[in-house]
Regions:
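Hydrophobic transmembrane alpha-helices
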Residues: 1-76
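Short, highly charged, low-complexity non-transmembrane loops/tails of multi-pass membrane proteins
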Residues: 198, 202-223
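Short helix-perturbing small/polar motifs within transmembrane alpha-helices
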Residues: 14-22, 96-161
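Alpha-helical membrane segments and adjacent membrane-interface helices in multi-pass membrane proteins
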Residues: 49-123
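Membrane-embedded alpha-helical hairpins and interfacial helices in multi-pass inner-membrane proteins
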Residues: 1-6, 130-201
């Protein structure tokens, strides 16, 4: 529990140093600052706070032989960025703790770290590497960041959580790794699909997306 608390506090401190609330400020509208518009990131942020706590609490609201958890943290990272994702994921865990009476405080803290903060942080680092060393186009963003990156980040984070003591009850290590691998793929498929939809139809909801970077003309040598 002390490891999870230290990770959560460190991540929250670093995120707050980035002043993430600036991303939610009003912006100049068609009439300039006299006609401000709300930040487009408010929509995905509120959607995460409404939907994701139920997803995290669901395994504790019913009794199943194999309790599997869906993360969603890489998707949150793609939508609102790491500085905002950190407090939002911690709040998600707190809401899930309130929704599920069977969820203990230690389990809720572990959920915040190993289901939320760690995969989101790994996804941020993966995204920085992809932007630095891979081609800049829409397919690379959707496939490497939305799909493949999510699979790898969620799986690695779940293995780290297992190493830290958050194991699946009544399941041996080999079967547990297989279950976590399969759940990472479900995370990847869902995140990749939603990333593709949002990038095409609601790009202003995706904080990590940039038309200037990923929609360069085909003849540009930097593409």
């Amino acid at each position: 529990m002390f490891l999870e608390a230290a990770i959560a506090l460190l991540a929250l401190l670093l995120a707050l140093l980035c002043r993430p609330w600036r991303m939610l400020g009003s912006r100049a509208g068609p009439g300039g600052m006299q006609d401000p518009v709300l930040s487009p990131l408010l929509t995905p942020l509120l959607a995460v706070l409404v939907l994701l706590p139920w997803v995290w609490a669901l395994p504790e609201l019913h009794k199943m032989p194999l309790q599997l958890h869906w993360s969603g943290a890489p998707l949150v990272l793609l939508l609102i960025g790491w500085p905002l994702a950190v407090p939002v994921l911690i709040a998600t865990s707190a809401i899930a703790y309130a929704l599920a009476p069977a969820l203990g405080l230690q389990d809720a803290l572990g959920m915040a770290v190993w289901q939320g903060l760690v995969p989101a942080t790994l996804a941020m680092l993966w995204g920085a590497a992809v932007r630095r060393w891979c081609w800049h186009n829409i397919f690379v963003f959707i496939f490497l960041r939305g799909f493949l990156g999510t699979v790898l980040c969620v799986f690695v984070a779940s293995l780290l959580g297992q190493w830290a003591g958050h194991v699946l009850p009544n399941v041996n290590d080999e079967l547990s790794r297989m279950a976590r691998w399969l759940m990472a793929w479900s995370d990847g498929v869902t995140t990749g699909m939603l990333t593709a939809v949002f990038v095409v139809f609601r790009p202003h909801w995706v904080a990590t997306w940039s038309d200037a970077i990923y929609l360069q003309p085909p003849g540009n040598p930097e593409s």
